[in-house]
Amino acid sequence: MKLWKRASGALKDRKTLFTIGFSRKTSFRNPDLDSAIIHATSHDDSSVDYHNAHRVYKWIRSSPANLKPLVHALSSRVNRTRSWIVALKALMLVHGVLCCKVTSLQEIRRLPFDLSDFSDGHSRPSKTWGFNAFIRAYFSFLDQYSFFLSDQIRRRHKKPQLDSVNQELERIEKLQSLLHMLLQIRPMADNMKKTLILEAMDCVVIEIFDIYGRICSAIAKLLIKIHPAAGKAEAVIALKIVKKATSQGEDLALYFEFCKEFGVSNAHDIPKFVTIPEEDIKAIEKVINGVEEEEVKKKEDEVEEEKSIILVERPELQTIITDKWEIFEDDFCFTCKDIKETDQHRKFNMDPSPLPLIVIDEPVYFTHTLPDLITF
């Protein structure tokens, strides 16, 4: 059965190479590059064709014009395959291309194919589920890494000045996210101790060394910039990054132990992972607490200022009902005279002086015209 699969895979590769021999060179196709890609991503699971892989890398380094033929050939190769061997070799080839870090890679952004839901179509799922999971995890990392690398190259050429603290924090967070995705790439099934898987794990371990080293270097530079004058938001993010770096250091130690037991050659010598000194963590916490204390003190000062303000309230108008009023002579004469004249026909002989201020039982009628006190 295995011999039949190998023979079938070799026949497919030869057929593809035969077809490429009749194709013409265009802006999207390069027969020589296509041939190197087919050899580097063959159906042979016993070895990796490093010679043709390095030919592809030389094509990419030689001219940016070779990027389009590479993308076209790789996407065409991967989209048509149902073999985990071809898919994994294609991912390893892409990984090597990204490590070239040439300027033209900024045009790729995301990978030109999708293996997030890959499933091998040549064997039963019970035998290939581990390979499928491995390829999906590897693709997820490379897809994000390609986007991150493209963004970094673009920023470097757009503005060469130094990044701000916020930009450095953002970059470290992305690197930590990439490292987390790398740690998910591991063989989980018992039948995965294959030459091709070990080669892929070697590539993963090398990438872990590179990314973790960049994280440690960036954190060392960042700790110098986080001082009492820095903002609270920056200090909070920095503390989160430092704690995550400590946690990832522990995860890396376990991951390398697993790789060593599995037989990954690059993991035989487990490195000493850098630990963040406790003094640096406390220094960041002091910055955060110092900013919080300043904010609390500022609020307390504002409250004290509000308490020290004396509010001057205007007296409100009040209505007073009383029978003790000052009566001026003019008002008194006017009242007495008019009331007497008005009440002559009613035959009331009363002295108006004892009348109450507000008449309730008997209204007073005035026959003369009242003066207009509103019109000016």
From Swiss-Prot:
One MF annotation (Gene Ontology) recorded for this entry: 1-phosphatidylinositol binding
InterPro entries: ANTH_dom (IPR011417), ANTH_dom_sf (IPR014712), ANTH_N_plant (IPR048050), AP180-like (IPR045192), ENTH (IPR013809), ENTH_VHS (IPR008942)
GO cellular component annotations of the record: clathrin-coated pit; clathrin-coated vesicle; Golgi apparatus
Keywords: Coated pit, Cytoplasmic vesicle, Endocytosis, Golgi apparatus, Membrane
Keyword Membrane appears in the UniProt entry: yes
Subcellular location: Membrane, Clathrin-coated pit; Golgi apparatus; Cytoplasmic vesicle, Clathrin-coated vesicle
GO biological process: one example: clathrin-dependent endocytosis
Keyword Membrane assigned: yes
ENTH domain mapped to chain residues: 25-156
Record-linked PROSITE patterns: ENTH
Name this protein carries in UniProt: Putative clathrin assembly protein At1g25240
Species of origin: Arabidopsis thaliana (Mouse-ear cress)
